[in-house]
Structure formats: C-alpha cells, structure tokens
Amino acid sequence: NIFDILGLEDKMDSVIGDIRDLEHLKKVFDEVQPEYVIHMASQPIVRDSYDRPVYTYETNVMGTVNIMECVRLSNSVKSFLNVTTDKVYDNKEQDKGYVETDFLDGYDPYSNSKSCSELVTHSYKKSFLNALPVSSKCRKCNRWRRFCKRQNSS
C-alpha cells in the first residue's frame, strides 16, 4: 500500500484500532500527543451499509465523534482533517463536479453517515475548536481512483 511504499511508518505515529472505542482513543492521544490528526477511518462500502447500517453509523458517525472528542481534550493537536467522500452530495446527475456549496444529501446509510461525519466535524469546530487553526473536511472522489488505475495500466 502507499503507506508502506512512502515509508511513512518511520515518519509518523500510526495506530491501528477501533474508532468506536473512545477509551482506547483517549489512551492513544495521551501517549502519542499528536499535532496533526488525519481522520480516514470508516466503514467505506456502500453495499455493506445496507446490510449493516448500525455498524456503519457507529463507525462513521460515532467514530468521528470519538476522534473529535479526543481532539477537543488534547492540548497537542494543531490541525485536524476529516477525509470523507463525494457521496455526501445530493447527486443530481450533472456533468459538472461538486463544489463546497452543493447540498449534502446521502440517502443510503454509507453516504448519509459520511454527511453526518462532516456535520459532527463542523459542530465540534464551531462549539469547541475555534482556536484550532485548521479543522476541515476533505472529500475524496472516485476520479482519483480512476486516475490511479490509468497510471498503473500505462
């Protein structure tokens, strides 16, 4: 994976765990004292979200709440980034890309849970983290995946 290819393990602290476990996350934040937090954890499969909606919401929404709570309680975090998906937008089948002012929608459990994750991030930013220089969202899209596939097949 790209994490290994870039040798990031030697350049940063990375912890594998369950973001639904707030107590474990608190211990990790206490031990690591992170300055930058990039939240990419999720239940990422749309089809699975229909079969396991509770797990999807627990992971994508409450997992984000847990991470944001750890950021709120931390004195070390300088920046937080929540990486979500373009699936958060109301899909109007247009030929143009989405922009930040487009409406959130997310009618299936996965998409809706990621929209909720963004709302959690926004709420924590406005309610608790105004002093944090950066607390934002980044929406990945499948165009990046298609680009990578094209590059690998060349």
Regions found by a protein language model. Name each.
Residues T64, N152-S154:
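Amphipathic alpha-helical segments in well-structured domains
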Residues N1-R139, W144:
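N-terminal Rossmann-like NAD(P)+-binding domain of SDR-like oxidoreductases, especially those catalyzing
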Residues S135, K149-Q151:
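Conserved loop-to-helix N-cap of the C-terminal "lid" that shapes the substrate pocket in Rossmann-like
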